[in-house]
Amino acid sequence: MNRITQRQNEAKFIEYLKAKRIVYRQCKKHQVFDVVSILMAIVLPVLGMLYNDIVNYLGAFGVLWTIIYLVTENYRKKKTEQGARIQEQFDTELFEIPWNGILCKNKVNSDTQIDLAKKYDGNDLLNWYSLEIDSWLPKPIAIILCQRINFSWELKQRKRYVAFLLVLLVTYYGIFIAFFIAKNIGFFDILLLIAPSISFLIYGVQNCLSLSNQIKSKNETLEQIDQILDKYARNRETPNENVLRQIQDVIYIERTVPEKIPDWFYKLAKSTNEDRTDNIIKSIKTKF
């Protein structure tokens, strides 16, 4: 009753995924600014404590670096939005649901998409959505299961990364504050010493707040999706196209947020998340 898992491996859809992967790769190249910010946050305050005569210079450099960091954020936002539109083209054409031109604006043109796809030489994009989404399922149910995968997969990753960032921020600034108190360092000097780490603080707080909001939104939408699946399990009621489009709107909006989890963190639990996704789909199908 649906051919989603078969059609997703057609050349057209693989090309979309290749283009999207390149765009996000271009975006994530600028995560080097995040890494540098973290290293600066660790090294520069220590240098300031060891060499008091360069504290003012370190503080000025910290402010300058923060400005550079914020400028790169604008580039990342644009690339993230481009990647989100390509992924939206993949989903809407695969699911055969309407494009929301009001929300998503224009599609990425074919020339740009083809040029991007040519840059990808990997072969790891088959079976984007779980093969546990059987062809016997009604098409609206198959679509909403795919949409559920988007929420469930990213929700777990975001929870882990927020916890990691909070521990990192509290530990880092806790150590320095304890040191400053122990050494009876004045408030103005503390500000000068911490100034080089401002970009790191912005990165950590910005991501924690943004990802926490996404977690809340994803949990709420996930509950609504499960209610729809429960209705189907009880009386075979399927969602209409309008409901599917509304859920897709939420997915698109959250994909446009530039605070992305680093690749190295994503890869740590990739295989575990894939197995977890398959098991969740299997569990849901037992209710049908």
Residue positions per predicted region:
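Terminal, compositionally biased low-complexity regions
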Residues: M1-L47
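Amphipathic, well-ordered alpha-helical segments in soluble domains
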Residues: Q147-N150, Y173, T221-Q224
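Cytosolic/matrix-facing juxtamembrane and C-terminal tails of multi-pass cellular membrane proteins
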Residues: N2-F13, L17, I22, L209-K287
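Membrane-interface, cytosolic juxtamembrane amphipathic helix immediately N-terminal to a transmembrane helix
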Residues: K12-V32, I144-V167
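Short N-terminal secondary-structure initiator segments
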Residues: M1-Y16, F61-L70, I133-L155
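Membrane-proximal, non-transmembrane interface segments of integral membrane proteins
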Residues: E81-Y161
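Alpha-helical transmembrane segments and their immediate juxtamembrane boundary regions
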Residues: C27-K78, K159-K216
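Inner-leaflet juxtamembrane helices
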Residues: Y69-G101, G204-I228
